[in-house]
């Protein structure tokens, strides 16, 4: 396989320059982004996925999976592995290493900071990922799998197939896999992701200070999955490479041991391809290729254009003596030789055994009469030269079985990291073991509460002395940690009472502990009186929010029932990966009018990002903010954005007063980011607000929604829309209901 890190969104400024140039040259009509490049984009909230899906709105992939013949699929995949095609011959007669790289690069874009990337959705099929330099030649791997996808149709997603192919390839080459979970559904259009600020491939403007990687990025250069295999910026320094590796893999939630296992295990298979200079031979990437190429790119005009003439990363050679078998040879070779720097035929920097040793060790991938020396990359030598990595590789050099187990677990984590909890795992290959990185929750060993119990609990909660604000804030804090990007967070597990979530500034830890103590008392009293039926704290927290909203709606003259579905359980601290869960902490949450000091992103932009992570649309975001303001759900208890004289009542007052022309808004003279709403005639301060409030009046799209909710005939509609959006957030992590 290729090295694991060989050599679309541009920044707004770069896009604008490019757009302006293109329009000047071609006469294209300027769009809104051209005229107003700094306007708030609501694109992350557009729900166009259903309209883009040709399978129809009623298609359910999990249902379709029930008809998948997994054993037949595995058999077919194993046949593909050794059925070498003339248009793209298999190295060593086996496509397994090629498919491992395919699977790795499908999953390896995942980054822990915002949960974006990963294999779910099959995004490698679309730009920009299909044309990243790091993904060169993987278009051919997908075409090799196309007959499999055609045969199994809707019962097998591309997302699952892209990951399964490499996993079965490893198994077919003698590696004992942990297992595999189906359940990744396909998207039908590319996700808009900020992959970096650079305007050119393989460039780097994402580091600061002592080569600290900017957030939220995981890769070190534009168009890479992880790091430059030749070393940072092509500098063949293994220690410097180790720094980059640790950062990049750490951004994916991998420990040192997992990182070493993945690199050493992955490079046990296959080879790198650099038979010629890419600039002399290789054509445009798939997205830029001519129409007759039909979605294939990187056409190679040198020699055969494939096989022994293949050009992918520019690096050339294999690491082991048996590249199509699982062996211990990578680590053996790493320590058996002293390595000296050389260059590949393409001019890339790589390493070979010193003094011309072992030149007859590695078989050629296509010509049985030829043999070669093994290679190492600068990033491979980092596993020997970095002190921490060296301890690991030396231990595994002496214990091949431990190395095998470590790689199996790390591979499973790599390829399932963005799937969320085990409840989303489907199929007969799912392992029985669970891992802390899956954010597990216990299985309930008691009877769930019924309607009568719900009524009793609501009454007890409302009689507990907690305010509407207390209950709404706590329920929101518990559920709104959820991210649709990697299905982490949410109310299930009641992790709001555990580290690190209990200490997040946005959750106001002291107030939170006060509220949780009362709710735990309600839970304890109920469970004490019931033998078989129990309630979790996770359910009590969500139920408290529902009860408070129903009471607030009643105050406003609306009799409503907030949907509630019991079944959540309470996780333990041991079930919570504190270090990775910490990345879910919001530094800005416009729904609670919270913005951490020093956080650079504009509060309005951060609000849209938070809404996107929750899977909300623009109307849902608008309804929630308007409702949460009048219910006094601000994190710090401030009155910013509380545009009502009747706080605690679920009214449309936020919108009525926001669009009221008797108010004129001015920036505060004393506090940055704060605005004052003055009576237009008297000049008296009526309200205070942040940009997370006023954006609903200044942005034309959001104002249209706000004006709608301000109408006299929209009060009932607003209340119901708020409840619907609230319930969507409360049940976002309830995959058992979907």
Curated annotation (Swiss-Prot):
Site of covalent link Tryptophyl-tyrosyl-methioninium (Tyr-Met) (with W-104): 226-252
Family to which this protein belongs: Belongs to the peroxidase family. Peroxidase/catalase subfamily.
The enzyme's E.C. designation: 1.11.1.21
Positions with a binding annotation for heme b: 267
Disulfide bonds: none
One GO molecular-function entry: heme binding
Biological role: Bifunctional enzyme with both catalase and broad-spectrum peroxidase activity.
Cofactor binding summary note: Binds 1 heme b (iron(II)-protoporphyrin IX) group per dimer.
Coiled coil: none
UniProt biased composition (Basic and acidic residues): 203-213
Post-translational modifications: Formation of the three residue Trp-Tyr-Met cross-link is important for the catalase, but not the peroxidase activity of the enzyme.
Organism this protein belongs to: Saccharophagus degradans (strain 2-40 / ATCC 43961 / DSM 17024)
InterPro entries: Catalase_peroxidase, Haem_peroxidase, Haem_peroxidase_sf, Peroxidases_AS, Peroxidases_heam-ligand_BS
UniProt protein name: Catalase-peroxidase
Cross-referenced SUPFAM superfamilies: Heme-dependent peroxidases
């Amino acid at each position: 396989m290729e090295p694991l890190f060989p050599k679309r969104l541009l920044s707004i400024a770069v896009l604008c320059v490019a757009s302006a140039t293109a329009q000047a040259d071609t006469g294209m009509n300027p769009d809104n982004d051209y005229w107003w490049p700094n306007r708030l984009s609501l694109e992350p909230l557009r729900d166009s996925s259903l309209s883009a899906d040709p399978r129809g709105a009623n298609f359910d992939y999990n249902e379709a999976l029930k008809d998948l013949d997994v054993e037949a699929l595995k058999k077919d995949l194993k046949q593909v592995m050794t059925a070498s095609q003339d248009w793209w011959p298999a190295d060593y007669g086996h496509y397994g290493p090629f498919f491992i790289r395919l699977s790795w690069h499908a999953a390896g874009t995942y980054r822990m900071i915002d949960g974006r990337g990963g294999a779910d959705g099959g995004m490698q099929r679309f730009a920009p990922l299909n044309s990243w330099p790091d993904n060169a030649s993987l278009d051919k791997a997908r075409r090799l799998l196309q007959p499999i996808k055609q045969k199994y149709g809707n019962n097998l997603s591309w997302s699952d197939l892209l990951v399964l192919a490499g996993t079965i390839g490893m198994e077919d080459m003698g590696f004992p896999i942990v297992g595999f979970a189906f359940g990744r559904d396909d998207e039908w259009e590319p996700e808009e992701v900020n992959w970096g600020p650079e305007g050119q491939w393989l460039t780097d403007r994402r580091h600061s200070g002592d080569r600290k990687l900017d957030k939220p990025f995981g890769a070190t250069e534009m168009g890479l999955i992880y790091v430059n295999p030749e070393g940072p910026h092509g500098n063949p320094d293994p220690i410097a490479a180790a720094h980059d590796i640790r950062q990049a893999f750490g951004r994916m939630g991998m420990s040192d041991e997992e990182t070493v296992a993945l690199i050493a295990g992955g490079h046990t298979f296959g080879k790198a391809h650099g038979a010629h200079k890419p600039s002399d031979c290789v054509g445009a990437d798939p997205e830029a290729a001519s129409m007759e190429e039909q979605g294939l790119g990187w056409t190679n005009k040198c020699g055969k254009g494939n096989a022994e003439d293949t050009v992918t990363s520019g690096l050339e050679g294999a690491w082991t003596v048996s590249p199509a078998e699982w062996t211990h040879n990578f680590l053996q070779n790493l320590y058996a030789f002293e390595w000296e720097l050389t260059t590949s035929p393409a001019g890339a920097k790589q390493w070979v055994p010193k003094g011309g040793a072992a030149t007859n060790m590695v078989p050629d991938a296509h010509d049985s009469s030829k043999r070669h020396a093994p290679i190492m990359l600068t990033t491979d030598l980092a596993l020997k030269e970095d002190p921490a990595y060296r301890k690991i590789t030396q231990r595994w050099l002496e214990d091949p079985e431990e190395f095998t187990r470590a790689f199996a677990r790390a591979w499973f984590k790599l390829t399932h990291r963005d799937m969320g909890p085990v409840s989303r795992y489907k199929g007969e290959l799912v392992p029985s073991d669970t891992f802390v990185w899956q954010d597990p929750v216990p299985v309930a060993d008691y009877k769930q509460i019924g309607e009568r119990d719900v009524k009793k609990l609501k009454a007890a909660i409302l009689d507990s002395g907690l305010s509407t604000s207390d209950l709404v804030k706590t329920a929101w804090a518990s559920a709104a940690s959820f991210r649709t990007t990697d299905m982490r967070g949410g109310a299930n597990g009641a992790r709001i009472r555990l580290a690190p979530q209990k200490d997040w500034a946005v959750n106001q830890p002291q107030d939170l502990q006060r509220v949780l103590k009362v709710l735990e008392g309600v839970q304890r009293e109920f469970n004490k009186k019931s033998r078989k039926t129990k309630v979790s704290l996770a359910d009590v927290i969500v139920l408290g929010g529902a009860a408070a909203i129903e009471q607030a709606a009643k105050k406003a003259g609306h009799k409503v029932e907030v949907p509630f579905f019991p079944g959540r359980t309470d996780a333990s601290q041991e079930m919570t990966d504190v270090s990775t869960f910490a990345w879910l902490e919001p530094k800005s949450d416009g729904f609670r009018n919270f913005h951490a000091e020093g956080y650079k992103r504009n509060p309005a932009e951060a609000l849209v990002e938070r809404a996107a992570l929750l899977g909300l649309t623009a109307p849902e975001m608008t309804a929630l903010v308007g409702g949460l303001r009048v219910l006094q759900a601000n994190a710090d208890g401030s009155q910013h954005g509380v545009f009502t004289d009747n706080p605690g009542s679920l009214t449309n007052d936020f919108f009525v007063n926001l669009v009221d022309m008797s108010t004129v808004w001015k920036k505060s003279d004393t506090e940055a980011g704060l605005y004052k709403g003055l009576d237009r005639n008297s000049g008296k301060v009526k309200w205070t607000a942040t940009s997370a409030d006023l954006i609903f009046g200044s942005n034309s799209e959001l104002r249209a929604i706000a004006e709608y909710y301000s109408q006299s005939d929209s009060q009932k509609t607003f209340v119901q829309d708020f409840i619907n959006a609230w319930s969507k957030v409360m049940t976002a992590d309830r995959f058992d209901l979907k």
